[in-house]
Every structure is written in structure tokens, then in C-alpha cells.
């Protein structure tokens, strides 16, 4: 005997209900708990590959809650809010920051720039509620040197791990590593 219309209707509603619940759960997890995204760009070399690494991001650090100097964060790009970027926090509120350490010599400044930038070094204080972020690969990074201090409200999460599935099952030391998974720890040391 063929199922009646009420059985098909019940099946449709049950399936739709579970699909909607699953979609809501996935949305909540990605928005508020955890997300995983592929890297694109060379600004974080050598910590992360330009392409093919997947970063694991904890959302409990959203809006800058609990972030520290040296943490890797995912944030909305200040010049394009629809884009996400990965950067390292190199200055916290109240810190005095050398804007561009890579250009702190007389070889990189023209005579006119030397006059307007107080010699070779230009320092700024990170305002309250902001952080200073830079890429690990300074020569290929668009970061706070370009768009100044970033509001903590743009921070979407903290990167805690990465993996490189394209590299196979062994890391650089020829040791087994599931999809080249690695924890990314904060390696900042305070020299003061």
C-alpha cells in the first residue's frame, strides 16, 4: 500500500524542520564559537602559507575581548568591511608604536620626508579601544602602517591553529601530522 498524502506531508515537515535546525546551529557556531577559513595572501608568511593553509579561529575573542600583544587575529579590513584579513597584534591601547620599523633609516627617506617625519622615526600612540596590527611579512602587508590603529570592534576572532592539507600527512621534520595541523601560540616576549 502506497503512503498517503499525510505521510508525505509529515516527512516533508520533519525533514524541513531538521534542515532548518541544522542551518541555525551551523550559523550560531560559525558566528559565535568557531570558524575555519583558507588563507589567501602573502602578508603572514612564514607563519602561514600564502595559499592552502586553513586557519582555525575562536570567536570568544570577537570585538577584541581577551586579545593580547602577539596574538594572531582575523578582522574586517578597515578599508573594505566585506573582506577579512589575518594580522598579528603588535600594539595595545596606550602603547607607543614605531609606525614603520622597516623604513627607520636615512636610506629609505627622502630629505623632505626626514623633515616631516621627525628624522627617520615616526611614533604614534595606540588610542583606547584600538590595536596596532601588522603582517609577519612586512614588505607585503597592508596593515596599521597603512590604515593606522584598528578599532577592536573589527576583530572577528583569534587564530589558534592552522593546517595545510595539501602538504600531506608529514610535517617538515618528517613526523606524522594529520593534515599538517599545528597550534599557533603567541610567541611575544616583552623586552622591557
Locations of regions flagged by a protein language model:
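Acidic, glycine-rich loop-and-strand cores that form catalytic or ligand-binding grooves
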Residues: 90-107
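Soluble extracytoplasmic domains of inner/organellar membrane proteins
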Residues: 119-165
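A generic structural signal for residues embedded in beta-strands
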Residues: 56-57, 75, 99, 133, ...
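Short, surface-exposed loop/helix-turn segments at secondary-structure junctions
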Residues: 109-118
